[in-house]
């Protein structure tokens, strides 16, 4: 081979390597760096939780991620056929507002499974009830979590903020949204006089607000006759309503109460008592820190009006540890600063990397520890 030919081969090989680097999959890059960081701190292997459109569109390399040891659990799928498509693509679970529909699709897929391997995979499939399963009950309330458990969801997915007293309060927005919540005293409550979680104590939140409004669709019900466990638990806890904003530690107590309700309590003779108690006794909690990466938007309505990553970790992971839930809880976030801190400070608690637009998986939106080589 001539010197010029060798030089040419070397040149084009370098071009090929450079091109490959340019088109490297951002989800794979992120999880490889996240996996390295977790391993360095003896933390659990992180999980990728991408928006379902990036799974269905082929942007997320599901099989390649799984081959490297990373589970893939997309959000938020409510259409049965899209559920079925992703199940057949091999995802490890799905986050959904309609766990009832997902369970039906899974039942059909399990019945048609051809191999033991496929049956085993489907038996492990994670049914994660988004905000408790808001398609059936007012979101992120005790009745929604009860409904999620009634549907035999294997995970309760929810959101958290931090109150003035450092409590991990459960709510999706950084403020108590008037679309879902009303004031218990009947006073007007709108977007204009909204209350941010960082500006109220957990006790005052439970005295002031009732979040029983329905607005998600015709199947979302706020009929308390459908939520006997939440009603009994609210009475036990001295709450003004089962629909008051709840918090992480209280949710843990509620699920324990749910198990006891169906094992030895008022629901022990229910036709579904045994399966409900058994499922709830091992149900997991996927708790999001509602914090966005700094600089992701300059829109005042979407800026962070909450505490910083460390206070989120202190409140949420503190509640998880205090209640002995490290083996059943995970922390998820779009703000990877939170997840880095969890891996460093609470290595027994798994982390879920929430992703949307792949353009946000590079640059300043990603903590330095998780950036691919050469990324600024």
Predicted regions and their residues:
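Positively charged n-region of N-terminal signal peptides that target proteins for export
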Residues: 1-4
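Bacterial N-terminal signal peptides
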Residues: 7-16
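Phosphate-group recognition and catalysis centered on beta-loop-alpha active-site segments
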Residues: 19-376
């Amino acid at each position: 081979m001539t010197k010029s030919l060798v030089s040419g081969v070397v040149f084009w090989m370098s071009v090929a390597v450079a091109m490959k680097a340019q088109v490297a999959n951002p989800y794979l890059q992120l999880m490889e760096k996240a996996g390295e960081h977790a391993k360095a701190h003896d933390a659990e292997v992180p999980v990728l939780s991408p928006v379902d459109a990036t799974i269905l569109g082929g942007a997320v390399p599901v099989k390649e991620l799984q081959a490297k040891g990373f589970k893939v659990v997309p959000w938020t799928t409510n259409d049965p056929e899209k559920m079925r498509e992703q199940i057949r693509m091999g995802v490890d679970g799905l986050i959904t507002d309609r766990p009832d529909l997902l369970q039906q699709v899974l039942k059909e897929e399990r019945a048609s499974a051809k191999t033991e391997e496929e049956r085993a995979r489907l038996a492990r499939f994670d049914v994660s009830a988004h905000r408790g399963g808001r398609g059936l009950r007012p979101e992120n309330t005790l009745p929604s979590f009860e409904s999620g458990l009634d549907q035999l969801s294997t995970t309760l997915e929810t959101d958290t903020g931090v109150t003035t007293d450092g409590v991990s309060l459960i709510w999706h927005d950084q403020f108590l949204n008037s679309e879902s919540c009303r004031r218990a005293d009947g006073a007007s409550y709108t977007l204009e006089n909204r209350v941010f979680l960082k500006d109220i104590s957990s006790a005052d939140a439970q005295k002031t607000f009732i979040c029983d409004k329905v607005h998600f669709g015709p199947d979302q019900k706020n009929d308390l006759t459908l939520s006997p466990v939440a009603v009994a638990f609210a009475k036990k806890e001295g709450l003004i309503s089962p629909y008051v904003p709840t918090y992480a530690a209280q949710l843990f107590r509620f699920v324990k109460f749910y198990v006891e309700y169906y094992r030895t309590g008022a629901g022990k003779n229910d036709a579904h008592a045994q399966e409900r108690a058994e499922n709830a006794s091992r149900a997991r909690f996927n708790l999001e820190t509602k914090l966005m990466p700094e600089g992701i938007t300059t829109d005042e309505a979407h800026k962070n009006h909450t505490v910083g990553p460390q206070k989120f970790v202190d409140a949420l992971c503190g509640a998880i540890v205090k209640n002995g839930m490290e083996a059943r809880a995970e922390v998820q976030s779009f703000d990877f600063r939170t997840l880095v801190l969890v891996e460093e400070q609470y290595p027994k608690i798994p982390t879920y990397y929430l992703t949307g637009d792949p353009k946000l998986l590079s640059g300043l939106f990603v903590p330095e520890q998780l950036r691919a080589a050469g990324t600024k």
